[in-house]
Amino acid sequence: VIKKHYYSWTDIERMCVSIVNQMYADNWRPDYIVGLTRGGNIPATIISNMTGIRCEALKVSLRDDKQGPESNLWMAEDAFGYEREPSATAGPLRKNILIVDDINDTGATFNWIKEDWPSGCLPDDKSWGTVWGNNVRFATLTENLASDFFDVQYTCHEINKAEEDVWLVYPWENVAEY
C-alpha cells in the first residue's frame, strides 16, 4: 500500500510564501514566472499574485498528456538573451525566469527543459551552461531527493521516494468529492 500525503490549500499558500522569501533572500527577482502544466500553474499563479510579477504557462506534461510537451522558442531566447536584430541601446538581454512545478519527482520535466531550450536557440553555444541556476531558476513545492535533477533553487518540502514511496495529493488534484 502506497502512503499518501495530502496537502491543504493552507499548506500550498505557506509553501508559496516560503518560495518568495527564499527568492528575495537571494536578492533575485524574475522578470516573469513560468508555471508548468498542470501541477505548476497554480503555485506559479499564487507566486505571481504575491509578487506582482507576470506569469506564463508552458506545457511540459510528460506523463499525463499523450501529445507530449510543447517547445517554446521565445522563452529560450529570453533565457539566453538572444536578439534577432541587435540594438545598440539594449540593456542586459538575458531575462530572469522562475520555472515553477508542484514536484521535482523524477527530474524528467526539468531535464527536458534544459535540453529543449538550447536545441532551438544557438544549440552549440557553450554559454548555455551559465544560464541554469543563474538567470533561469527552478522552484518546486516538493523536492524528491531521489530525483535525477539536482538544480532546484527554491523548494519547501523534501521527500525521498527511494526510501519511502509516497503519493502526493495536492488540493487541486483532490477532486473525488466533486
Predicted segments, located by residue:
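Conserved glycine-rich SAM-binding loop
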Residues: 39
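Short, glycine/charge-rich flexible loops or terminal/linker lids adjacent to PRPP-binding catalytic cores
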Residues: 49-98, 105-115
